[in-house]
């Protein structure tokens, strides 16, 4: 089983909005996920698209380094999650000398691609036959 990881940190997308996009692609084939992200209207879909493409390239390089064959159509998104990054705190001037705080949130996004094991394929086939 080939596994590759790609991370992006301090991306200027709120974690809540990024999680909506990541939930759409979790568990899907990598190429199907790229197609979903390409046409998704959410703003967070562009950095996540680049991240999935980077994870695919990482898998390709890892397979080349170990002299093993990698079928890119077998890659699927094994794990994908969004963690909260640092928050930039800004102030908005308001009436009568007040100031309201604006939180500009950032995200840490992680995508793990994997190829299914023979054991995974067998258990999936068993579940499908029941």
Curated annotation (Swiss-Prot):
Q: Which cysteines are joined by disulfide bonds?
A: none
GO cellular component, alphabetical, reads: cytosolic large ribosomal subunit
Q: Reply yes or no: does the keyword Endoplasmic reticulum apply.
A: no
Which SUPFAM superfamilies has this protein been placed in? Answer: Ribosomal protein L22
Superkingdom of this entry's organism? Answer: Bacteria
Q: Which UniProt keywords apply?
A: Ribonucleoprotein, Ribosomal protein, RNA-binding, rRNA-binding
Identify the InterPro entries for this entry. Answer: Ribosomal_uL22, Ribosomal_uL22_bac/chlpt-type, Ribosomal_uL22_bac/org-type, Ribosomal_uL22_CS, Ribosomal_uL22_sf
HAMAP family recorded: Ribosomal_uL22_B
What does this gene product do?
A: This protein binds specifically to 23S rRNA; its binding is stimulated by other ribosomal proteins, e.g. L4, L17, and L20. It is important during the early stages of 50S assembly. It makes multiple contacts with different domains of the 23S rRNA in the assembled 50S subunit and ribosome. The globular domain of the protein is located near the polypeptide exit tunnel on the outside of the subunit, while an extended beta-hairpin is found that lines the wall of the exit tunnel in the center of the 70S ribosome.
Fetch the NCBIfam families from UniProt: rplV_bact
Give the protein name, as stated in the record. Answer: Large ribosomal subunit protein uL22
Q: Which organism is it from?
A: Clavibacter sepedonicus (Clavibacter michiganensis subsp. sepedonicus)
- UniProt lists the gene as rplV
